[in-house]
């Protein structure tokens, strides 16, 4: 089952919809980022009961520390490997390069696989495009963990 807008966590009928997914015993593809800010222990438990190969979350605003705290709090609730728990990192939109890089490092440190998305890529500075190339190419990202050393 491919969910094109899977923000079930914000839906008033989230519990019934999640139960339908669980009962279906089908593989569930949450194609967009689930809103971690709305996560509770009950919601995490129901997501864990779904057959899924990957989870996506997002951390768009570097000033939003609640998002990071929730990501940190619930990482252990999802038993998927690090490379199967992705977090979209919006860049080139109300953030500095330093803030973008800090989010990438912090997410990696707590067990998520960051995925850099560049807003209006054609206007982005070269270092932002390089950050995206470094972070999203997982062979490079794992081989060279320090962006400053990436050539």
Predicted regions and their residues:
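Core AdoMet radical
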Residues: 1-71, 84-93, 113-117
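Anion (oxyanion) recognition and catalysis
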Residues: 22, 79, 105-109
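Short, basic (Lys/Arg/His-rich) helix/loop patches that form interaction surfaces
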Residues: 77-83
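Auxiliary Fe-S-binding modules of radical SAM enzymes
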Residues: 90-151
């Amino acid at each position: 089952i491919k969910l094109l807008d899977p923000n079930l966590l914000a839906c008033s009928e989230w519990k019934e919809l999640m139960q339908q997914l669980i009962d279906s015993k089908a593989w569930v593809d949450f194609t967009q980022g689930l809103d971690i800010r709305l996560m509770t222990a009950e919601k995490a438990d129901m997501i864990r009961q779904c057959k899924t190969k990957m989870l996506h979350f997002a951390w768009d605003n570097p000033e939003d520390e609640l998002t990071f705290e929730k990501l940190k709090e619930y990482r252990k609730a999802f038993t998927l490997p690090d490379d199967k728990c992705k977090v979209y990192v919006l860049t080139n939109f109300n953030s500095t390069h330093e803030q973008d890089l800090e989010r990438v490092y912090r997410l990696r440190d707590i067990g998520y696989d960051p995925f850099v998305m560049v807003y209006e890529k054609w206007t982005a500075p070269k270092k932002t495009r390089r950050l995206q190339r470094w972070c999203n190419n997982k062979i490079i990202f794992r081989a060279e963990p320090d962006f400053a050393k990436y050539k």
